[in-house]
Amino acid sequence: MPIIHVLIAKNTGAVLCEYTDYQGNFLTIARMILKNIKQNTRHTVQYESYQCHYINQDNLTYLCITSNFPEDTTFAFLMEVQKQFLAQNNYDDIMKEQSYFFQNFKNNLKNILDYYNKCPEKTLNGEIIKNLVDAKSIAIENVEKLIDRDQKLNITVQKSDKLYDQSKNINSLANSIKNQKKA
């Protein structure tokens, strides 16, 4: 089964935008869940035969209702909803507006929902691969920086050893000249 219902709400319970293609009491279920959400959490709640997944961050909740849908894909879906919603809307404006003010975002919700419903595993695998490639490139970059630092440190140590040897030679030369003058 697919992602059935998606909504974006403020912590006050005001639903800013929602979308579903299905008939049912999904908004009622969502409102019951919204009442019990703690700030800055990510969780899945079972309600009868449905799973309600949500991300609450910065006083906004991104919630969807699914039936037998991969949890990882669901959270990838919610993060995409969050990313696009915040990219299109100013946070301060979001906090000022009333319920259903952002229904113009409904088409975006539909497009994201359709995309994730059509190929959930492929979408998740693509996200995982992208994240792994990004992590790999960052790790390679960090290793290259470490190697570069190590090389610079080795050069500095070699120069330091050379200067130390030179200072010992100069010191013993100075001592021998001093001893010759005394004699």
What does each model-found stretch correspond to?
Residues 5-7:
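Generic short beta-strand
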Residues 2-3, 12-183:
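Acidic, low-complexity cytosolic segments
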